[in-house]
């Protein structure tokens, strides 16, 4: 039997109950964007506002709200909903339980320096200095004193925190900077009272996945994107 709700707290409870420790949904639904959620014994889905409606489906056969033009599906079986086509390469969602380990980072405050690194090595980054969601930027320097990598922790409307705009200087890649940076950011976030940090990663970016896993992140969801034809 399919159940539906327009109550945000009920939806959050359903997601926690059904998805357990692999629950990316909690990052995406908020009082500002939540529309509806649906569940049965083994699947969960939700709808939020977004051009005009965007949905997540968890589990094979999860309910697809007909209002959605764009969706992301996390299911063991690969299937294409009727009237939809695959879009892009999908994404993975990772999560870490923060812990104060003493791992060091530099707290970055020079927007020009951060933007220079992003423009040079990751111009498509989603977050820039001054973004209203930013909590703090962290970075590491190489032996020449150059900014080797940087990343930002942001707070989404849901109240949960996400690591974004992770960028490593091209010449400094493959030297462990990303893993060190993420460990340091996790440690500093713990001091700020941030318990969990989420992270989106492209499936093809295997090097990044390995770095995040070494730093303590766990994969909690793999999604395929679809858009209405």
Residue ranges and their predicted role:
Residues 2-6, 12-70, 149-164:
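Conserved donor-binding loop and adjoining core beta-sheet/short helix segment
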Residues 79, 212, 217:
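Conserved active-site tyrosine of GNAT-family acetyltransferases
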Residues 126-136, 141-143, 148-169:
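A conserved beta-strand-loop-helix scaffold within acyl/acetyltransferase catalytic domains
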Residues 43-103:
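Acyl-donor-binding surface of acyltransferase catalytic domains
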Residues 85-96, 198, 218-229:
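Conserved catalytic-core motifs of GNAT/GCN5-like acyltransferases
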Residues 60-69, 168, 174-191, 209-214:
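Conserved acetyl-CoA-binding loop-helix of GNAT-fold acetyltransferases
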Residues 73-78, 199-209, 225-229:
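Conserved beta-strand-loop-alpha-helix junction that forms the acyl-donor binding cleft
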Residues 1-24, 92, 96-125:
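Short amphipathic alpha-helix that is part of the acyltransferase structural core
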